[in-house]
């Protein structure tokens, strides 16, 4: 025998369980919509504890289609409207069924009428096209908020103090006064002839070969390039205050790293060349066959990646200062003093990057990774130098070149 659902009590107010504002909308406590965790999942914080669905009395999960309802009634109402099912609903008991969490699935018509009676809004149910548009709008708003948050975080990041600005200006001027050709390097560079560096003749133990003509061309510019690195360091007060022994160790350790950085920031994607010492534009194979071997690839790749950073003179100068003041060089006496100097440059560097407000996400940590790349280039060159010294005629090496790169750690 079929069980007959209970009848609705006449005169009952289906909105008694909800609190409404004058405009008919459900009030949200404190206007908050954050989530809180319960044993049954996530529920909005504006719900009272154990608040019931206004349709069936089950535990409510949120504010759906203008009413506080459970997930079941929300889904039932949405499907009914989206698929236009309500004209097909019927009731065996004159539309007088009581709807609760036990009987709600027994009569679709009475359940739908209860949804309408408590105030669920049909016009808030979106069809597929509107739902896609809404989802797109939500994503756009989310992206907009993300960008606004990024801008706010950039604005809140500390910028250089007056003392740091002094440090920054000194480093910048030291770089500019020792950086050959300055900003005019493109107009003044000369391309190494294509026939130089294309016919390696001296074999190296690592399998590479060296073109002695190209090597000879590079040695002509290496001495002034080294001298400019030394001059840069001496213009930094923190460096000049160190003992001569520490100055020599730091210079020998960072010289190739700084020269590589100065070449890398003068990478030209149009000609795919690096400009050495501000005057000689060379191709990858020429630099490789001229003695640098695989080190050439590393410097070219660094140049390509740095081109996206759009570094200015100050950032290059501070990067050089950080490389110079490295405490892990063997034999240093004033390690603590050098470490404090590097920390001062790093902090000023970070604050200056904040001041510049680059558009690249995570610009600062990405830039610091280039320090690691340059340290690797320096280590690879030290190993390469040992092979070159054995295989190439000693008279081809300038005295300053030998003085700086001999006895380096590999």
From Swiss-Prot:
> Residue ranges of the NR LBD domain?
163-407
| One GO CC annotation | cytoplasm
Sites where the protein binds 3,3',5-triiodo-L-thyronine: 228, 277
Q: Which UniProt keywords apply?
A: Cytoplasm, DNA-binding, Metal-binding, Nucleus, Receptor, Transcription, Transcription regulation, Zinc, Zinc-finger
Q: Which residues bind DNA?
A: 53-127
| Binding residues annotated for Zn(2+) 1, in chain numbering | 53, 56, 70, 73
Q: What gene, per UniProt, encodes this protein? A: THRA
Q: What's the protein here called?
A: Thyroid hormone receptor alpha
Purpose: Nuclear hormone receptor that can act as a repressor or activator of transcription. High affinity receptor for thyroid hormones, including triiodothyronine and thyroxine.
Which family does the entry's similarity section mention? Answer: Belongs to the nuclear hormone receptor family. NR1 subfamily.
What Pfam families does the annotation carry? Answer: Hormone_recep (PF00104), zf-C4 (PF00105)
For this entry, list what GO says about its biological process.
cell differentiation; negative regulation of transcription by RNA polymerase II; positive regulation of transcription by RNA polymerase II; retinoic acid receptor signaling pathway; thyroid hormone receptor signaling pathway
In the record's own words, the domains note is: Composed of three domains: a modulating N-terminal domain, a DNA-binding domain and a C-terminal ligand-binding domain.
**Superkingdom, according to UniProt?**
Eukaryota
Q: Where is this region: Modulating?
A: 1-52
* Gene3D superfamilies for the chain: Erythroid Transcription Factor GATA-1, subunit A, Retinoid X Receptor
